[in-house]
Amino acid sequence: MCPSYMVTLDERDTTRARANMLRSVIDGTLPPQELTGEHMKKVMDLCVGCKACKTECPSQVDVASMKTEVLYQMGREHGFSVRQRAAGHMRRGLALAALLPSLYNASSSTRLARRAAALAGIDPRRRLPSVARKTFSKRFADLPQGAGPARVALFNDTWNEYQRPEIGVGAVRLFAAAGVEVLLPRVVCCGRPMLSEGLVDEARKNARRNLDLLYPLVESGVPLVGLEPSCILTLRDDYRKLLPEDGRVEKLSGAARLFEEALLELEAQPPLSEGSPVLLHGHCHQKALVGTGPTEDALALASDVEVVDSGCCGMAGLFGYERGHYEISMKMGERRLFPAVRGAGERVVVAPGTSCREQILDGTGRRALHPAEYLAQLLAE
């Protein structure tokens, strides 16, 4: 069921209401201008793009893709806001911040920075994202490598490159311990932030660029491994819709793996010591398109795993950062996730999604780990 409806109990926030509104425009019950009108904007506003309706709804209505199309049409008619363009091109912004990480991190926590962010539509109660002192790509050459012949290609997403390179470091160490060589191909943003803002043309351009960059590896049989579920699953799911006529897409989609899937497919697992019990919160796109099974099984190589039946965490990419969404975002988290984390005791909290980990930190003060980060801590010396 739609996460926003679960906290508002407003019929307008149901999958049914959103689908019916669109159907009414398509069949002529409502005039065409309603597609980009104020009422449509309100109906779509609290859709968090979780994709649950794509698998849980009996009709398999993909409202997340519908919202992307609505935002695209609104942008074409009324123009895209500065906030939308900045959010869609987050990788570009973080790359600039990473040029002077200490200065950026020091200034981003100031009251002036929060006020400036508020002018761009960010709720001032949210912490602004920090950047790492050294990007993942600059650390990569110094990391250990497996002797092969098994190889994987790591899709270096925005968050791993600029914010949490320790996750990528952990993943490479785990693969190396299993004898696997990790390749780091050049990539551009997967396009997920652009799709979330309706910037479909820009997302399509990035999809085509990534396809050109990655296809030679994929064609040679190298699996493409992603650390951020929403990024790698954009390649697996959304690229088919963005580039339906490109015959290479199916091969790329078939080669895309979540980190945990790739780890489980190895002939030999890395040597791990026994870890603490784990509380796992799954990412929405992963739950909708893959399920949490691979993550549970990967963590179970070293730990007892309990899964939170929590639905959406409430952050949903940039949704929870936006002014006007903060309260409902926190209510989504408070439904089940935050109480479960507060009651986790000695269990280590694990969440594959970047926005999920940020929401858990904001809502409970507790830092959640990525599966690769957690398992790398357990590598036997």
Task: Locate each region found by the language model.
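Ferredoxin-type iron-sulfur electron-transfer modules and their immediate structural context
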Residues: 1-46, 65-79, 88, 103
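Glycine- and acidic
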Residues: 3-7, 25-32, 39-55, 152-158, ...
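Cysteine-centered iron-sulfur cluster-binding motifs in ferredoxin-type domains/subunits
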Residues: 1-3, 12, 39-61, 93, ...
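Iron-sulfur cluster-binding electron-transfer modules in prokaryotic oxidoreductases
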Residues: 64-381
